[in-house]
Amino acid sequence: MSSASSLAPVRALALSPPRPFRHGARRLARAPRAAASADPSPTASKLEGAAAEAYMATLAEDLTHLFDDRGIDRSLYEPTVRFEDPLTKYDDIEGYLFNIAMLRRVFDPTYTMHAIALTGDWEVSTRWTMDMSLPLPWRPSLTFTGTSVMGIDPATMRVATHFDTWDAISTQGFFLETKSPEAVAEVLRQVFDLTVQPDLETPEYVVLRRYAEYEIRRYPDVVVAETKTGGESGVSEGKRLAAGGMTGGGGGGDGSFNPFGALAGYIFGGNAEEKKMEMTTPVFTSDDGKMQFVMGRALGDDPSALPAPNDGERVGLGIRTGGVFAAVRFNGVATDASAAEAERRLSERLARDGHARKPGAPASLAQYNDPLTNPIRRRNDVLVEIEGFDNARLDL
């Protein structure tokens, strides 16, 4: 992962003025109101209209340089800018810039902004994802999502306060002042997640929200080779969420059909061109009775351009449709029971947090490791598609 920042499609909103932010409170986005078009002046009572749009565009562009060689423009910030997040607190621009430099040097971060909005008379908020890595033997990756609430000094049009929130914790503010262990616990939970992702090509996804117990991710469409985990006896007998042929057996009428072996045979030369293709990760199995191997990006995005499978009755080529999915991770040997329990917990959390599962969409299990991997280090994700998710919202 490289030190970089990127700007996802940004939406500028004019929202009604917020209540003052309190330690321990979760910020709520308010209903939109109409914006005026007047430019700010020394007597302006609020930032609005074209001036607000221009200011947010400038700030959004500058934040794309948060972790690159150019860095942010310090002239956009007050010398006495006050910064606070769940782990750190600084009271001037030098501390602010030191924190950015430290993150870049130690964690090799990538920053993606998803939305920027006017959330008060002189307040702008952003929603973002930050991915980091640590140079430790087990190569931990850390992901944080949250909001930045920036107060603007009307006299100078500079950022005077910057307050970061994390979606993964409920008590916001600097932990030494809130006396909450949540932020430290969240960092340690990610650092000491010992599950490992193999050095194989993996479909990229964006984490839109990282909560303490699950993530919401955006996946692209990917080309897949697929088969039924039920073999010739049909889906009903092989309707298994867990690994099918990866753990032996796949539900065929005589127990001999191995869905993993059928797909592996295709990519390792069992096709019309005898073409050998690279193994990727993860292997997807779903509770509608399918197992899928993701085809490498170098093979293109058209399934019809791939060599035909020799076992055309059992192995097919198609598209695994992307979208917004909730995901929960667990380690160990994935079984039908462990995957079903993970799905149950995930569904409960989604209902609690107001996210709706897409009706009729199957749950799926993503398995990243081969059977020789120590079970403690195996990564398994259960995914369920959700609908009606608004990534620009600042309160979820």
Question: Over which residues does each language-model region extend?
Answer:
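N-terminal chloroplast transit peptides
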Residues: M1-A25
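N-terminal mitochondrial targeting presequences
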Residues: M1-A8, L28, P32-P42
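A beta-strand edge to alpha-helix "cap/lid" segment located at domain peripheries
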Residues: P18-R27, P32, D131-T195
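Short, aromatic-enriched amphipathic alpha-helices that serve as compact interaction elements
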Residues: K46-D68
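A solvent-exposed, acidic/Ser-Thr-rich amphipathic alpha-helical stretch
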Residues: A57, E61, R70-R127
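Hydrophobic/aromatic beta-strand elements that line small-molecule binding cavities or substrate pockets
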Residues: Y111-A117, T145-I152, V315
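A short, structured loop/turn motif at beta-sheet edges
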Residues: I116-E123, G151-V159, I319-G322, A351-R357
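A solvent-exposed interaction/effector surface
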Residues: E186-L396
